[in-house]
Design a protein with these regions (language model features):
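Short, structured coil/loop segments at alpha-helix boundaries
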Residues: 26, 47-48, 116-117, 184, ...
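Exposed, interaction-prone extracellular/peripheral surfaces
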Residues: 2-13, 174, 192, 220-454
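Short, charge-rich amphipathic segments
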Residues: 22-35, 92, 168, 204-225, ...
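Short amphipathic alpha-helical segments, especially helix-boundary/capping motifs
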Residues: 12-17, 38-40, 69-73, 115-118, ...
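An amphipathic, basic-hydrophobic helix/alpha-beta surface used to engage anionic
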Residues: 49-51, 59-320, 388-392, 406
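Short N-terminal helix-initiation segments at or just after the protein's N-terminus
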Residues: 20-24, 36-44, 86, 121-125, ...
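Extracellular/lumenal glycan-associated context and N-glycosylation machinery
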Residues: 1-79
Length: 454
């Protein structure tokens, strides 16, 4: 969507005739000239029946060849969606209008609205009809969100042919819409993984940042202490250099690090990435985010997955085609994402942040490239240390332990939500000592997550 133009006084612009309509008028003029020439030729050579039949046949075929292209000219498709986001199991109404702008009728039109799997349509999504000049036909259907994701509604493919069905033309309209089906959330019980208290009540055990307003006491000077921390009055009283101590900064929220690399989920379908274990990981992230935000804390998101929006080209313009295969190819989304960028949502609070996070998680797809441990190490210098780094992954190996150890040495509080596939045998863990691990095999485990403290 383009930004609204700046407000201002604009001179009235004369109405311009669309290029397609002007092209149609030129074709009409050419057709009348051709018909006149044929009639003149027929008048001069009317002595032979076979010549007459040949001229008539040629005229019929010529007109038939022009009709399919002429029918597609001057057609306008308008689309509207009742909403752009919907919960799983929710519905949204899709409306479509097909308008004939030209002076001639549009004959023998077959239109079909392309709707991606994940949105189950109920209602009219195709039709066969002819449109009079300036006539508009309207249709609507109800779309049911059946699974998490970003789904395209449209484009419409319009097919027309000559009266004999010998020549067919296809048009793919550029008008499309998108519906985001949000992930499920589960109510988490009281408590929090780092203890029986909410995050904001848990002081940090190690911290590179301290709260200077929370004076704790003094201690003897050690090599490397900053001179700005020296407590001069205590030094004068004791005769030894004394350094001020402050309480470590309290934790302000959680950073959800979600593993979405294709190598970590070998059982997930390559094209759609829909898999019960993958969906459970996304549900866990959305549920934890909601729990923390409701308690007034901040949530950030980091993932090595891809954005489903990258599957759809931004320069979509539609077009007209002679072959059905070309039209169908044009309506398909890319099977792969051309370039992957790690998903990163800045820390935030409140309802707006929850909506932002759920939308980002809805569009999250599996992607090749960096693993989650590699991403955590690469992003460690810029991650906020006031947030708990909570990794959500299906495997505790693959370098995750080393990455969490690096983060702990840098002053981060860390934890792991282990998404284990039903029936899978527990894998050997290689995590640093003291890192809390929370096993999640289904949504029931998520409901009990808040009461766990390891």
């Amino acid at each position: 969507m383009s930004d609204p133009s700046a407000a201002g006084t604009v001179a009235p612009v004369p109405v311009q005739v669309p290029f397609e309509v002007r092209s149609l008028r030129r074709r009409q003029t050419l057709l009348w000239l051709l018909a006149s020439a044929l009639l003149a030729l027929l008048a001069l050579l009317s002595s032979g029946f076979f010549l007459y039949a040949a001229v008539v046949t040629a005229a019929v075929l010529g007109i038939g060849a022009l009709l399919p292209g002429a029918s597609l000219l001057g057609l306008e498709v308008r689309r509207s969606l009742e909403a752009e986001t919907v919960e799983i199991g929710g519905t949204v109404e899709s409306r479509i209008e097909l308008h004939n702008l030209k002076d001639l009728p549009a004959l023998w039109l077959f239109w079909k609205d392309e709707i991606e799997p994940g949105l189950a349509p109920k209602g009219i999504t195709c039709g066969f009809q002819s449109l009079k000049s300036e006539e508009t036909v309207r249709s609507s259907c109800i779309l049911h969100g059946t699974r998490r994701g970003l789904f395209r509604v449209g484009p419409s493919m319009i097919e027309t042919s000559d009266p004999l069905g010998l020549i067919r033309r296809f048009r793919v309209d550029p008008e499309v819409g998108f519906v985001t089906v949000l992930p499920r959330t589960v109510d988490i019980g009281p408590g929090w993984p780092l203890g029986y208290r909410p995050i904001h009540e848990v002081p940090r055990r190690r911290s590179l940042s301290e709260d200077p307003s929370r004076f704790l006491g003094v201690r003897d000077y050690r090599a490397g202490d900053s001179l700005r921390r020296i407590h001069w009055r205590a030094t004068a009283r004791s005769g030894r250099l004394q350094v001020k101590l402050f309480e470590p900064s309290v934790l302000e929220g959680v950073l959800l690090a979600v593993e979405m690399g294709t190598a970590a989920w070998p059982h997930a379908p390559e094209e759609t990435g829909t898999d019960p274990a993958v969906e459970l990981a996304v549900t866990a992230a959305a549920s934890i985010a909601e729990f923390v935000l409701v308690n007034g804390q901040a949530v950030s998101l980091l993932s090595n997955g891809g954005d489903a929006a990258e599957r759809y080209p931004s320069d979509w313009k539609g077009g007209s085609f002679r072959r059905l295969e070309d039209a169908l190819h044009e309506t398909e989304a890319r099977r792969g994402i051309p370039a992957y960028r790690p998903l990163d949502v800045e820390p935030g609070q409140g309802r707006w942040q929850l909506d932002h996070l759920r939308t980002a998680l809805a569009r999250l797809t599996l992607a090749p490239g960096l693993t989650l441990p590699e991403l955590l190490i690469a992003e460690a210098p810029r991650l906020p240390r006031s947030l708990v780094v909570l990794a959500i992954a299906p495997d505790l190996g693959g370098g995750l332990g080393e990455a969490l150890a690096v983060l702990r040495r840098s002053g981060f509080e860390v934890g792991v939500v282990w998404i284990q596939r039903a029936g899978a045998e527990p894998a050997a863990a290689s995590l640093p000592e003291g890192v809390p691990v929370y096993l999640v095999q289904d949504e029931t485990d998520l409901e009990r997550l808040g009461a766990q403290a390891l």
